[in-house]
Amino acid sequence: VNKLLVFYGSYRADRMGIRLAHYMVRRFSERGSDVELIDAQAVGLPMLDRMYKEYAPGKAPPAMEALARKIVAAEAFLFVAGEYNWGMQPGLKNLTDHFREEWFWRPAALATYSAGRLAGARASYAWHPTLAEMGMVAVPSTIGVGQVSAALDVEGLPTGSGGEALDKAFDKFAAVLDWWADAAVEQTARKGPPY
């Protein structure tokens, strides 16, 4: 993936998932990708009232305008998603809902996490149809990290058996996203989007 955006959406005081976001940024950078972390809390979009497309050109809030340009320029997306009450993080969902066409025709991968042993699996189930509805191809390979605070240290470096399992799963996960990103770039160059 030449240009990858990694999205993270927790607003909690003790954000454990940021460790996984940093891990993903580092590992994809080591593979040669141009990676940027998009932290929903840092971007600071309000609760959804108006989507980006509902503003006149040049009239969207500056943070929304800047993020729209980054989304359009990206070849692929990676959502680092925590599981909240059997579902998706509200902060990450709110950020994604501000955009629509900007997401179209690119692959998206999911790396989920939780404090418990289920590794964010239920968040993954919620995100797959959402990403598809928003015009992305949700790639079939996912990563789930259970007990995230034990699997990654504060710098996002793997620790213990959970960290070992993550490292072992990463290369296949990244290769699948790379394949879909290459396919999307080639098809867009060859034929262009259907609309």
Residue ranges and their predicted role:
Residues V1-N94, P158-Y195:
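N-terminal beta1-alpha1-beta2 submodule of the flavodoxin-like/Rossmannoid cofactor-binding fold
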Residues H22-Y23, T96, A126-P129:
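Short, solvent-exposed amphipathic alpha-helical segments in soluble enzyme
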Residues Y52-K53, D97-R100, A132-G135, D182:
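A generic structural signal for secondary-structure junctions
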Residues F104-R106:
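His-Asp phosphorelay/catalytic-motif detector in bacterial-type signaling
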